């Protein structure tokens, strides 16, 4: 788990908008101490979402016609090709298997189908990362490798290191992804 989170930390270290821009080792992340107290076994503070941040993000959506009218350069345009919405039961006690997420599996398969692409067509990924287990479950359900150095599971550095401003983390993910896609479509 520490190695997984160290990879997230390394991405955050290169993210100019991340809250924690120091690349931490697996040992630093896992070792419990005064600055990294145990929150809930097996996760110390550095494996939990960091919501004590002062951040914001925004995305402006408009038609291509409006973008042309506003003279937004075409190389700044990013098009969403598909989207889905799914959720597992909110009550953890009602879930059949805590290590699975039918919603992620079904929603992920459907969005790829709607976009007409496969996982191998995707270079950039950002998996919701409130805790390592959320990343492990999502990666498993989507068929993503946990240790793929060529395709990290985050573009921001995740909620621990990039910052998790309560309900706005995904907006940070989308905004960062838009920048990444402009650089490398």
Language-model features and meaning:
Residues 1-53, 57-59, 64-66, 72-161, ...:
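Conserved "HGTGT" condensation-loop signature of ketosynthase/thiolase-family condensing enzymes
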Residues 161-167:
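Glycine-rich phosphate/pyrophosphate-binding beta-alpha loops
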């Amino acid at each position: 788990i520490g190695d997984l989170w160290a990879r997230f930390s390394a991405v955050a270290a290169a993210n100019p908008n991340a809250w924690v821009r120091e690349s931490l080792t697996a040992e630093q992340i896992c070792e419990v101490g005064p600055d990294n107290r145990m929150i809930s076994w097996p996760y110390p503070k550095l494996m939990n979402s960091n919501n004590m941040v002062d951040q914001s993000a925004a995305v402006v959506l408009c038609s291509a016609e409006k973008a042309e009218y506003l003279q937004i350069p075409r190389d700044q345009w990013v098009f969403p090709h598909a989207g889905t919405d799914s959720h597992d039961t909110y009550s953890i006690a009602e879930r059949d298997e805590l290590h699975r997420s039918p919603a992620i599996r079904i929603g992920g398969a459907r969005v790829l189908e709607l976009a007409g692409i496969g996982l191998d067509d995707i270079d950039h990924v950002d998996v919701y990362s409130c805790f390592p287990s959320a990343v492990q479950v999502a990666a498993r359900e989507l068929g993503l490798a946990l240790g793929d150095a060529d395709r990290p599971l985050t573009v921001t550095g995740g909620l621990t290191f990039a910052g998790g401003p309560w309900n706005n983390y995904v907006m940070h993910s989308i905004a960062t992804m838009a920048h990444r896609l402009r650089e490398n479509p």
